[in-house]
Structures are given as C-alpha cells and as structure tokens.
Amino acid sequence: MNIYTRLKRSNCIYYDVKLVKNGKAVVAKALYDTGCSLREPVTGSIVHIVEYETIKPVLEGDEKAEQRIYVIPYNSVGKKDGILYAVKIDEMIVNREEQEVTIREPILAIYEGKLSGKGYYQIILNSEFY
C-alpha cells in the first residue's frame, strides 16, 4: 500500500446510517466528506449523496416520488456542470460515536454507480450535516 492510500484511509470517517421513508428502512455505511458541500439551489438545504441500489428499497412503491424530484447542480474533479437528481425522505439516522443524530426530511442526491470502488460506503454525508 502506498503512502497516499494510507493517508487517505487514515483520514476517513465512516458512520452507520439508517434511511427511512414511508415506514421502510435500509441501513448502509456512510463516509463523512469534508469536501461535500452540495446544496439544493432553491432552499439552500444541504444534500447528501446515496447510491441508487442502496435507496431503491425505500423508494419502491412510492408513486409520488417522481413528482418530488430535486435537481442538484455540482462540480467535482473531472466533472464540470454536472447534475444529480435528488429525493427527500422522512429521516436519516446517523450513528455517530455512541450518539444517534436524526435528520428530519433530508435531501438525498441519487448516484447511479458505486461511490466507493471497494464498497467501503454507499452514502456520502455533507460536511455540514451536524
């Protein structure tokens, strides 16, 4: 393992997160990303990122979900003027160092692929989540 990989891993903060919508829930691993500052452009609400396959079980059967889609513009390394589509769920519960943090009606941008090539996490938490 090279020095860059070791430094990168040592600075990562992971949390267990529960996503809840309409009585359905999924649990996944999240990366707290100090560089993630996504916001919904109209309200200014913070936005987190989730893999589609992770959130799919809580969205299934919600016919009205398509009517409540948010469009989130973003820029990142290698991607200028990107767009992510987002949804609002009932709550997100973050298990943070022996403490649960409940976020009511969080906005989650949906990413079609894998956020972590090695599967370490399925959610990226906005740097301002707490």
Please name every model-derived segment.
Residues 15-31, 65-130:
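Aspartyl protease catalytic core from the pepsin/retropepsin fold
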Residues 24, 37, 54-55, 99:
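Generic "edge-of-domain/loop-turn" microfeature
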Residues 2-7, 34-35, 61, 78-81, ...:
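Intrinsically disordered, low-complexity segments enriched in polar/charged residues with Gly/Pro
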Residues 38-40, 45-74:
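Cytosolic, membrane-proximal regulatory domains of ion/volume homeostasis and mechanosensation machinery
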Residues 1-42, 46-49:
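Canonical alpha-helical transmembrane segment with a positive-inside/aromatic-interface signature
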